[in-house]
Each structure stands twice: as structure tokens, then as C-alpha cells.
């Protein structure tokens, strides 16, 4: 029987020592309510911007490995990106990814929201668990795949935008400081919430 589930895109290259970083982090947590993710290196975006090619044919593996120690990032808060690791019991409890997000747009934040509702507060991107991502070759850049309107599906399902969820709940793109707390309901929160509700009203008529 296996205890952990690692979800990855099929256009990702796992950098050395990723498994040890993940194993050590899981040992430190000592419970099953967590969502641990890697740090993406991409040609034009990602957590770390570094060009080693946009396809497997162009991939300069040696360049990546020779410079990996220079590609720095802190452990980061609220990551919702692949690759990620969760306990298999937690995956089963929330029924994994939701089918209405097929073929995948916004499926990650939806999964995170289901985990949040289940009481998960550790959403941690690991600085030393690095992958090189060639950039959505399976879905977004594939002309044969019809894209789902995942952001609208998320909005209708949860009543807020993915951006609102990532900003006020997951605190995405900030340095990891520990388990997350409930959103701070200040002026910015309510202003952004109002924008979410206005957008919800709009997409409801589409």
C-alpha cells in the first residue's frame, strides 16, 4: 500500500534530490493535512525564470544541472502549482480533482479549495524541490485540446475568483511563514470580494 500521491504534468523534468527534500518535509509535519509542492523553473515565467529550452528536443539538461545551485528561491506560501504531494487518504477524502475542470484549467485551485474546506492549512512550496517545466505542452499549447473555462467554473462553484482565493486564502507568492490562517477581512479583502461578486453576476448570464 502506498501512502503518498504525487501529481505532476507530463512536461516536467525533476531535478536531483527532489525526493529527499519531500521526504524530509513530510517527516517534519507529522500529520496528513498538508499540500506540498515543488518550485517550477520555466523559460519565461514560473517561480524561477531560467531558459533551458521550451521543448524536450531543445532541452539543455547540462546547463540546468550546472547552474541549479544558483537558482535560488525561498520556501513559499500558498503554492497551488504542480508538482504537488498529498497523503492518499486526503486525496480520496476530497475525491481528487473535480471532473468539471477537465482538461485542467483551474483544477489546481479548486483542489486546494476542497483541501481548505477539509481543514488543510499547510500549503507549502519547497525551495529545494525543483522541476523544469516546458510550459503546458499538453493543454494550453496543444491545438487539439479544447480548453475549459476553468476560472468561470471556479467562480460559479465557490462564489469567488481564483485570484481572490490565491491572494486572500493561500497568500500565494509570499515567503512561507507557517500554517495559513483565515483571511484578514480588511478593506482590501472586501473590495476584492465585491469585484468577485460583480464578476460572478456577469458570468452567470454567459
How would you describe each model-predicted region?
Residues 2-13:
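Short beta-strand-to-loop acidic/aromatic patch adjacent to the donor-nucleotide binding site
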Residues 65-89:
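A recurrent flexible, glycine/aromatic-enriched loop bordering the glycosyltransferase active site
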Residues 36-53:
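Short beta-strand-to-loop element that shapes/binds the nucleotide-sugar donor at the catalytic cleft/hinge
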Residues 12-25:
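Acidic donor-binding/catalytic loop of UDP-sugar-dependent glycosyltransferases
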Residues 41, 102, 124-144, 153:
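Active-site donor/metal-binding and catalytic loop motifs
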Residues 145-149, 164-206:
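Non-catalytic, C-terminal membrane-associated alpha-helical segments of glycosyltransferases
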Residues 77-83, 92-125, 129-132:
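Donor nucleotide-sugar recognition loop
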Residues 128, 141-168:
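Catalytic core of nucleotide-sugar-dependent glycosyltransferases
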Amino acid at each position: 500500500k502506498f501512502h503518498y500521491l504525487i501529481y505532476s504534468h507530463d512536461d516536467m523534468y525533476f531535478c536531483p534530490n527532489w525526493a529527499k527534500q519531500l521526504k524530509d518535509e513530510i517527516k517534519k509535519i507529522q500529520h496528513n493535512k498538508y499540500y506540498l509542492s515543488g518550485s517550477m523553473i520555466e523559460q519565461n515565467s514560473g517561480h524561477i525564470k531560467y531558459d533551458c529550452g521550451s521543448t524536450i528536443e531543445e532541452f539543455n539538461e547540462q546547463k540546468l544541472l550546472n547552474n541549479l545551485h544558483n537558482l535560488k528561491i525561498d520556501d513559499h506560501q500558498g503554492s497551488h502549482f504542480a508538482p504537488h504531494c498529498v497523503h492518499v487518504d486526503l486525496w480520496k477524502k476530497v475525491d481528487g480533482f473535480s471532473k468539471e475542470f477537465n482538461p485542467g484549467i483551474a483544477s489546481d485551485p479548486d483542489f486546494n479549495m476542497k483541501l481548505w474546506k477539509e481543514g488543510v492549512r499547510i500549503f507549502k512550496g519547497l525551495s529545494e524541490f525543483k522541476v523544469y517545466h516546458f510550459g503546458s505542452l499538453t493543454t494550453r499549447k496543444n491545438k487539439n485540446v479544447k480548453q475549459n473555462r476553468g476560472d468561470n467554473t471556479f467562480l460559479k462553484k465557490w462564489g469567488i475568483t481564483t485570484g481572490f482565493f490565491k491572494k486572500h486564502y493561500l497568500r500565494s507568492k509570499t515567503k512561507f511563514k507557517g500554517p495559513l490562517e483565515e483571511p484578514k477581512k480588511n478593506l482590501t479583502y472586501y473590495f476584492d470580494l465585491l469585484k468577485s461578486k460583480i464578476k460572478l453576476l456577469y458570468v452567470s448570464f454567459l
